[in-house]
Curated annotation (Swiss-Prot):
Its main location: cytoplasm. It comes from Shewanella baltica (strain OS185). The keyword Metal-binding applies. InterPro entries: Aminotrans_V_dom, Aminotrans_V_PyrdxlP_BS, Cys_deSase_IscS, Cysteine_dSase, PyrdxlP-dep_Trfase, PyrdxlP-dep_Trfase_major, PyrdxlP-dep_Trfase_small. [2Fe-2S] cluster binds at residue 328. The gene is iscS. This is Cysteine desulfurase IscS.
């Protein structure tokens, strides 16, 4: 067993060896290294064919048409292109956008930028289980609302939104629906023929593909128009210029094909490991799951250990590669804004750990994790004056702390 045990699959996944092998075939002189836009010789034609195959593989994962797939550098760029692209193209129709307070920073900061440009954004509060209630979404809709951007699966707490219901509501009001699927593509079934979603952001490195590559699904019927954010050679039907990185695209395509073929078996195995982990630690006093316990992606478990300081817990769990929030904000000592939005106080938000399990996690690793977590919590609480006060029956919310 390799230490530390990797339980941070929501931050990134290792590239599947089958994906890495395919990628390597597109890099050297012996392989398919040509520029897919070079139409005058075989090297370019081979590269273009490899890109076309990958585009089809990604389209098949979400039951889309291959012409609806636009390659980007990742979900952050896809989110930027979708949200800014719609806002800039449809600004004459309206300047109101709806999103939620628990979105990834790539959505929130894009919306903040649009606010600086004169757009108006409504940030919806989730319910205590982390899911946006439909009535709140409907109540926020206005005549000048042009876009709703709600994530499929939350990156910190793993809850799954009812995208079918959101899609129906948006379509009935003539509002474009964008979905950030960085955490769900390849893990949760997505069918664009059944779900009325107009734009989907996809990330390669969250589904055992390479970093630095992603895709944006852009619906053709009814047709969604975007204003390009990257200008140049007019690649990707003018929506995203830049030489296509054949090796990364082939990697993303292979990752999508494997995910589609193995989704059900992966989901069952990973879900069983997640349940094993929770069943092994839920007996620890004052331990709580954050987010809905049922409507969640199989590999995610976000737990608050009350009366334990998050950073000291992270240090105590040095044998486990886990996080106290999203990797993109883990350098910050601020408590998770997602957990705060669920109504957790600073202390509870600070004492939370995100465990995310994936394709290469083993039973042995989960057994070891349970042991390490149990021992660490006991040890830290033994040293905690707050835990002692709580055990003595003192209501810590009533304590008047002296200010220095």
């Amino acid at each position: 067993m390799k230490l530390p045990i990797y339980l941070d699959y929501a931050a990134t996944t290792p590239v599947d060896p089958r994906v890495a092998e395919k990628m390597f075939q597109c890099m050297t002189m012996d392989g398919i290294f040509g520029n897919p836009a070079s139409r005058s010789h075989r090297y370019g034609w081979q590269a273009e064919e490899a890109v076309d195959i990958a585009r089809n593989q990604i389209a098949e994962l979400i039951n889309a048409d291959h012409r609806e797939i636009v390659f980007t550098s990742g979900a952050t760029e896809s989110n930027n292109l979708a949200i800014k692209g719609v806002a800039h193209f449809y600004h004459k129709k309206g300047k109101h956008i709806i999103t939620s307070k628990t979105e990834h920073k790539a959505v929130l900061d894009t919306c903040r930028q649009l606010e600086r440009e004169g757009f108006e954004v409504t940030y919806l509060e989730p319910a205590a289980n982390g899911i946006i209630p439909m009535e709140r979404l409907e109540a926020a809709m206005r005549d000048d609302t042009i876009l709703v951007s709600i994530m499929h699966v939350n990156n910190e707490i793993g809850v799954i939104h009812d995208i079918d219901a959101i899609g129906e509501l948006c379509r009935s009001k003539g509002i474009i629906f964008h979905m950030d699927a960085a955490q769900s593509a390849g893990k949760v079934p997505i069918d664009v023929q059944a779900t009325k979603v107009d734009l989907i952001s996809i990330s390669g490195h969250k589904m055992y593909g390479p970093k630095g590559i992603g895709a944006l699904y852009v619906r053709r019927k009814p047709r969604i128009r975007l204003e390009a954010q990257m200008h140049g050679g007019g690649h990707e039907r003018g929506m995203r210029s830049g030489t296509l990185p054949t090796h990364q695209i082939v990697g993303l395509g292979e990752a999508a094909a494997i995910a589609k073929a193995e989704m059900a078996s992966d989901d069952a195995r990973i879900g069983a490991l997640r349940d094993k982990l929770w069943n092994g630690i839920k007996h620890i006093e004052e331990t709580y799951i954050n987010g809905d316990a049922i409507e969640r992606v199989s590999g995610s478990l976000n737990v608050s250990f009350n009366y334990v300081e998050g950073e000291s817990l992270m240090m105590a769990l040095k044998d486990l590669a886990v996080s106290s929030g999203s990797a993109c904000t883990s350098a910050s000592l601020e408590p998770s804004y997602v957990l705060r939005a669920l109504g957790l106080n600073d202390e509870m938000a600070h004492s939370s750990i995100r465990f995310s399990i994936g394709r290469f996690t083993t039973e042995e690793e989960i057994d070891h994790a349970i042991e390490v977590i149990t021992q660490s919590i006991d040890k830290l609480r033994e040293m905690s004056p707050l835990w002692e006060m709580f055990k003595d029956g003192i209501d810590l919310n009533q304590v008047q702390w002296a200010h220095h």
